[in-house]
C-alpha cells in the first residue's frame, strides 16, 4: 500500500470517528440524557389539582343499593311514660297498662302503671348471696301472681315480657354461665333500664323475640326492646356479649345506650341488626374496645349529644346502613384509634355538629359508600396516620349551618383508590394538611375550596393533583407524580406555591377564572414532562421556577398576565407562547433563561436585556441530523474498505475462460 493510500485512510478514519461522536451526542440529546453546555436539566417534580365542580358531596344519610338494606325512614316516637318514670316520676304511669319489674336493693316490685301489685324480697331465696342477678329476679317472679313476666324457658334461656328498671344504687348482673341468653319480647315497653345504677352483661346473648315465630324481630320500625342506663353514677358494662335485633326510634331506646352521666365499657362484644348498634347520650368516659358493630339499620356506633372522654379503640364497624362510627352534637375530648370501619352505606368515621377536640388516628377506613373520614361542623380534630382506601371521598372537612369547621389537622394519612382524595369546603377555616400521600385517585387528589395550608403532601396517579378554589391557600413542598394535571386554580382564588415538584402529562399549573398564583420561596418549584408547563388566563407571578422536558413552557391566554423572576424554562417547542394582542404589556420577564426551538412566540418582549433567550434544535431536527450522521458514517466506512479491493486487482490480467 502506497504512502498516499495510508494517509487517505487515516484521514477517512478520523472523519468517521468524529461523525460517530456527533451522531452519538445527537442521539443522547434527543433522549434527554445529555444537553449542550449552558442548558439545564430540571429536578424531578410533581403537583396536582382537580376541578371541584366534578366532586360529589356525599349525603350524610347516603344509602347504598348494593350490599345494604334501605335504611329505615326515621319515624321518631316519644314513649310516654319513659322507661325511667317508674323510679323518677311514678305519677306519670297512673292509669297506664304498662307493666314493669322495679329492682331495689332488698327485692323487687311488680307494677302496672303506678300501682304496686306485688313485692318480693331477695332474702327469701334459699341461696341468695347478696348479688342481684337476672336469675334471682326470675326466682322471685316465679312466686308472684305474674310468673310469666320473666321465666326460664330452657336451661340458661330467659324470656322477659315486661320492662326491668333498676333503682339508684343497685347493681344487676346478667352473666354466664347461669344465663346464656336473654330474650326480650318484641312488645312496647319491654326493656332493661337503670337509674343511677349499674348493669353488667357478661358472656351472654341478648335479643328481641317474637314468640309467634320463635325468632328475633327483624323489623327496625317495630317498637323493639332495648337496654338503657342513665343518671349520675350510672354504669353499663358489656363484656364478651352479643346484642342483636334491638331498638326503636325513641329517645335512648336505639338498641344499647349509655345515657346522661353514665360511664362503663364494652369489651369484646358484638352489636348487630339493631336500630343503632350502640349509642351514648351525654355519657362520660365510656370505653369501646375490641368490639364489633355490624349490619345495623342506621349507625354502627353513635356517640351523641355532649358525650365526652370516650375511648374507641380496636373495634370493627361494617355493613351498617349509614355511618360506621359517628360522633354528633357536641361529642368532645375523645379518641378513635386502631379501628377498622369498612363497607358501610355512608361514611366510615364521622365528626358532626360541634364534635370538636377529638383525635382520629391509626384507623383503617375503606370501601365506604360516602366519605372515609368526615369532619363536618367540628373543630380542632386531629386526623393522623390513617389508611383511607376505596371510598367515594377519602377525607373531607366542611362546615355547615349546624357548626363551623376550624383549625382541623390532617396529617400523615395514606389515601388510595378513592374517587377523590381530600376535600376542604363549606366554610372550613384554617385547615392544615401535612405529609399526606394520596395515590391512585380516580378524579382529584386534593380539592381546596377554602383557605388551606398544605405542607409536603404527595399526590400520585390522579387526573388532577390539586384543585384550589376560593380564598387563599398555600402549598409548600407539594409533590405530584404520574398525573395528568398538576395544580388547577379557579374562581378567583389566590394560591402561593413554594418548592413544588410537579411531574405531569398534560399541564403542570393551570391558572384560570381570574385566579392568581405566586410561585416563590427559597426552594425551586419544578415542572417536568408536561405538554404545557404553565397555562395562564389569570395572573401568574413566578419566582425561582424551573421547567424541563415540557413541550411548551408557558402559555399566556389573551386574558392572562405574567411576571417571571429567575425562571429557567427548557421546552421542546415554545418557551413562552403569547396568545392575543398586546403581549408585551402583559409580561414582565427578568433574569430568566428560556431555551426552546422558539423561545418566545406570538409577541415581542419590550425588554430582554436581563434575560437569556436561546433557540435550540427541535427534536425533529435532532432526529434528522442523527440520520444524516449515520448515513455519512456508512458512506465513509464503504470508502475506507472498497479501494483496497480495486488496488489489489488493478493491472492483473483476467484469467482465460475455456470454452465448453
Language-model features, listed with the residues they occupy:
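Predominantly soluble domains enriched in secretory-pathway, periplasmic, or organellar proteins
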Residues: 383-385, 409-412, 433-437, 452-458, ...
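Extended amphipathic alpha-helical coiled-coil/heptad-repeat regions
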Residues: 349, 368-380, 384-391, 399, ...
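Beta-strand/loop edge motif enriched in small/polar residues
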Residues: 10-15, 26-313, 317-336, 341-345, ...
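N-terminal export and membrane-targeting signals
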Residues: 1-17
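Sec-dependent N-terminal signal peptides of Gram-positive bacterial secreted proteins and lipoproteins
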Residues: 20-23
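Extracytoplasmic/lumenal ectodomains and periplasmic regions of secretory and membrane proteins
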Residues: 556-602
